Amino acid sequence: MPLYEHVLIARQDLSNAQAEGLIEHFSTVIGDNGGKVLGTEYWGVKTMAYKINKNRKGHYGFLRTDAPSAAVQEMERLARLHDDVMRVLTIKVDGHDEGPSVQMQKRDDRGDREERGDRGDRGDRGPRGDRGPREDRGPRPERR
């Protein structure tokens, strides 16, 4: 069966327990339709880049599944009909990564990020050679 990853965004006014219950509900939908849920994660309340249905924040949930396409379509259909779910994203993947998702890893544990250091190509802002001191330029013009 194909492997999928799903991200659900639920309304911000739900409690954490209700949001986690929503993830469990859709996990059972996948299971009832012949699929297997390989893992679930609750990412918490996050601020979104733009408003969705007048909400600036949302509860994020993540599911890793091994399910037939009919089960995924049924889960997406029910999620879109559910009043508490604002968005659903489903991606077909070649394989699932072991361990927690990138969202759940601590910042220090992310191996692909390098330390920025002092950014040697840019130094501190030194004197501006194209301008002299302010008193040499005369008074600033009046604003109207």
Curated annotation (Swiss-Prot):
Compositional bias (Basic and acidic residues): 93-144
Location of the region described as Disordered in the Swiss-Prot/TrEMBL record: 92-144
GO cellular component: cytosolic small ribosomal subunit
Keywords: Ribonucleoprotein, Ribosomal protein, RNA-binding, rRNA-binding
Keyword Ribonucleoprotein: yes
Keyword presence, Lipid biosynthesis: no
GO molecular function, one term: small ribosomal subunit rRNA binding
Pfam family of the protein (one): Ribosomal_S6
GO biological process, one term: translation
Entry function: Binds together with bS18 to 16S ribosomal RNA.
Family membership: Belongs to the bacterial ribosomal protein bS6 family.
HAMAP family for this protein: Ribosomal_bS6 (MF_00360)
Protein name: Small ribosomal subunit protein bS6
Organism: Rhodobacter capsulatus (strain ATCC BAA-309 / NBRC 16581 / SB1003)
